[in-house]
Amino acid sequence: MKKTLLLALALFATIGLYAQQPGRPQLPKAMTEYEKGTKPSETNRLRQEYPRIDPQTRKAYFKFYLPLAHSVTVSVPNDFKGTKDIDGVWTIETDPLPVGFHYYFVTVDGARLTDPNTYAYYGYGLTAGGIEVPEGPEGNYYRFNKDVPHGQVRSLNYYSKTNGTYRHINVYVPASYETGKKRYPVLYLLHGSGENEEGWIDQGHVDFILDNMIAAGEAQEMIVVVMSGDMRYTPDIRDVPGKTVSDIYVDDLVPFIDKTFRTIPNRENRAMAGLSRGGGQTTSTVLDNHNMDKFAWMGLLSGLFRVTDENVKTVFGGAFADPATFNKQIRLLHISWGSDEGNFGFPASCAAVQKQGINCVTFVSEGTAHEWLTWRRSFRDFAKRLFKK
């Protein structure tokens, strides 16, 4: 197995480089015979032609020059087996794929690898390839628009006393941040399980979404802190009994952001939201840990949210027991999901809190599942309601 893995890695090291170097032999002709009507995926690295997408059929095409390989499979996430020509070029054609972003892996002779032709993305707890099956003009809200002002995404580290180590965040500031002394509300935004704080930028395009919405007058200017939902546990890093990531956010991160950026440092101008597990961490931080005095806006994007008629008065530390108090403290409870997500129980849970008298706004992304296109659409609906006076 070790020999197979080393061989696969050596072969993959040539992909995308072999034909680019002056004086090197050219790759077989099949590598430059592109399928009619296809275009390179927007997630491809510079000068890489594969994977390619047919916008009409939504099929994806992959080619690899791996003459010594015996089998090549691409998983998107279903498995598609490749065929090999006499020159050693493997071609893989998928079935029609749903629009939106998808992680994928390449398996060469049993060794699962990340395709070096695309940028690397963190998903399923692993580094994966990524492919974007494009929407039509309806997807322009999350695309880069050269005609609108653009904010910045800043990469920072901060020290967590709670965890005894540094932690990484990405911070979006709107285009106007550098031009004046204005102060801004802050959204703290979480990823889901198996992903990290890069996801909302690289896969979700939250910066492009806000650039476009702010320019169109559809969203308030805001700072967005994209943070990690995980804690580090090693012999050299402090594991404080009873402490969670919620304590890190409240005790370490919020003070750091208020000190570092021009924020409006009060609950009325502070929000928290997250997708999937990050939605559960949002309810845990704001409701279970009784931090409604620090956050007034909440967004759960396919977030863990299990509420029934029987437990509505006791769940989340009894946060819903007094609807009048809750509605006064939480300016927005926004719950969203994809229509094809399966039995997560979102409609029933929302109905239970609404029956209790809790103000709850819902949004359903039609035709999407537990995926980034759902969360892009959901974030857009959430953002247009956020920090409205």
Locations of regions flagged by a protein language model:
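Bacterial Sec-dependent N-terminal signal peptides
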Residues: M1-G23
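Non-catalytic cap/lid and distal C-terminal segments of serine-dependent acyl enzymes
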Residues: P22-F80, K84-K389
